[in-house]
Every structure is written in structure tokens, then in C-alpha cells.
Amino acid sequence: MSEAKPAGGGALVRLLHPRSVAIVGASPTPGALGASVLTNLERSRFSGDIHLVNPNRDVIGNRPCLKSVDALPLGVDVAVLAIPRVAVLDTIRALAARQVGAAVIFSAGFAEGGEAGMKDQRELAAIAAASGMVVLGPNCLGFVNQVHGVALTFVETPAVPLGDQPGVGIVSQSGAMAAVLGVMLGSRALGVSYSISTGNEAVTGVEDYLEFLIDDPRTRVIGMIVEQFRQPRRFLQIAARARQAGKQIVLLHPGRSSAARESAATHTGALAGDHALMTVKVRRQGVVLAESLEELGDIIEIAARCPASPRGGVLYVTESGAFKALTLDLCEQQGVPLPLLDDQNAPLFRAAIPAFVPVSNPLDLTAQALVDPDLYRRTIAAAIADQRFGCIVLGIIQTDPVTSKLKFPPIIKALRELKPGKPVIFAGLDDGAAVPPEYIAGLR
């Protein structure tokens, strides 16, 4: 597939930070796409102008309706098309005539729907190119901008202002996965700056939005779910820019199997390339690859809470000999540096832990901290003082609220008192354990 002309940053601003929005296919029916978009806009307290278009209604709620796109004022920033696929091309032509800057198209059935759909998608792209219109989609869920309070999506979206801290940007060809990832990050108390679903990428693609987020001061980490890069060379160039700017990209890249590549073609019309080759190339540019959606969330959280990449090795603290062995296998597989520890080269650790516990890395504390809770503090203090370690991972077993009460308070107290100058990652074992939420909040 030939590489499209990049969308300019100014054009994307009209889409992602609009001053005026038109909803084509506005509806009073709860659950209808147009109704959901309006609800999200009002919930996010969008401060710009909202124009509703519905030929069969004079008013929806307290807002007047226009009979057609032709009645829109000139130069509306973005129009959301909550209409059937058969009406999309004529509507895009009419929007171009009204000098609308951008369009969000939910409708499916274009490139992923066979030759006829592909032909219509090419026509859509040609109209947009001739008019300078930015198009998000088709076959997408739209986007959410929590920085400025704009939610142009039909998925119910709570208004969660970003606050003063930089957030996580999400760019995904899959709208459903973008929504799931956003909920996952919210449950981890991580703010999302932008969440953008690109769908079929008829006009703009993941590369355009990645470039926008790299230049966005409110975005620190960028999570991506991409089945196929339509502009791979450009993506690698932008990834290099992200690395220079200190912004971590974390990528979930489905498509390793032939079946997954066929699925991508029916999902977003993507033509998946050489997955193994792309994996090597993106890693060279500092992109971190995730193997699952859950791992994507974990890596994003680590990158967001530890913005400076640690220098030096990793100390793993475990409470299980079996988990120690699993950790050693995984570290060897992933090439994680593990400085060797023993009684002779680690006197601080030897003094901190019981005599029957071997000094090693990973360091297996056994269950001793249940009767000696200060063991956590002594171990963490030794790791902080040891310059061989740039990062500490606490693999703590969590099984029930009673055990959690014995373990979490001394760990939280130790971290608050010691104020580590290096990242400490709490990797609790057994995510199904009923750990009181105040302990999780205390660790964060």
C-alpha cells in the first residue's frame, strides 16, 4: 500500500481540539449513536458550538436541529457522522462544500467489506484530499480528549479531567481495545490525555496521531494497538523522535500468525506485513512491545510512574523458591541484567536478612516477613544503598485480606520513610486476591 501524505498538526488540532462540532444523524433516542455523542459532549462540558443535523426533527432536547448539512455555517471544525454507510460519501461531499475541517466516521463496510467498500473508501480519501479535510475512520469509535473536554465517540465516556500531571495517550486501530485499555488505565489511577481510534485509516493513520502526541506537552507515555502499519518507514522515524523527546511508546502488535493477519484484513482492511521484521525494527527505536492487553497496561503503568529509565541492574525480591526459579527463567529469556549477590559481595543484604536465607538475586525472603515485618524495610534499604541496582521489583505473594494486612502496611511505611531514589515496582502475585483498595492506593 502506498504511503499517504502526512496530516499537518494544525489540521489535527481542528479535529482533536475543536471549537465547533456538528453531529450529523443526531437523535433523541437513548442509545442511538448520535444521541450518545451529544450526551458525551455535554457530560464533558464542551464549551464550543454544537450543531445538530436531523431532517426529521426541529429540536432535540433544548437544541435546534438543522435539516441538512447544507444549512451548517461555513467552517465548522469537525462533523461526526452517525449515519448509515450508504449516506457517507454524499455527506462528506456536502461537508467539504461547507468547508468543514474534519470528520469522524463511525460507519463500517468500507475497505474491510470487499471491493465495493474499498472503492468507496478511495473516493472518500479523494474528497478529503481535494478539500483538505481530516478524516478519522471510517469504522472507528472516534476519540476522547480529556485535556480540553471533548468526547466524540458513541461509547459512554465519563469526564475525567487530566489535572496537572501529564497523562497517557492511546492510539489504536481497534476502537474496542482502545476503550478497554482506557478503562484499565483508569482503574490504575492513570490519567488518559487522548484516546484515539483510527479504524480503517482512509485519510489519517496511527502515524499522524502518534506525531501529534509526541508534540503534546500533556502526554508522557503513548500506548498503541496496531495490527498493521500503513506507513512503516514513517512510523520508525516518528518513534525515533519519541525516543529523543523522552516519550515512551508501548506497542501491542497483533498479527504474528497467518490467521491473525487474515482477521486484520476483515477487521479494518489492514494488509499485515512481516510481523517478525517489524518487531525487530521497532525495538531498535526504543519501542517496548507487549504480548497481551494486560501486559500493555502493566508496561504503560511502569513507564508512566517511572518516567526516567533506570540505569543498572534489577533486584528481584520474592517470597517463593518456585517463583524465584520462574523469575530466573524469564530474566534469561528477556535479557534482563541480574547482578549476582552472595555473602561476600553484598554485606548490606547479609546484615538485613536472616542467616538461613541465602543472599542471592532474586532474593527469596520466604515467609519470614510474616513474623518479622521489618524485614521488608531492611531489604529495601539495602537495595537502595547498593549502586549496582537501578530498579527494585517486589514480587510479594498476596492471597487474602488478613495476609495483606500483615504485609502491605510495613512495605508502604518503608517506602514512605526511605523515599527511594530509584524505581520500586510492586509485582503482586495472585491478582485475584482481595487486597483492600487502600493498600493499592498507598503503594501508588
Range-by-range predicted roles:
Residues M1-R444:
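Catalytic-core regions of core metabolic enzymes
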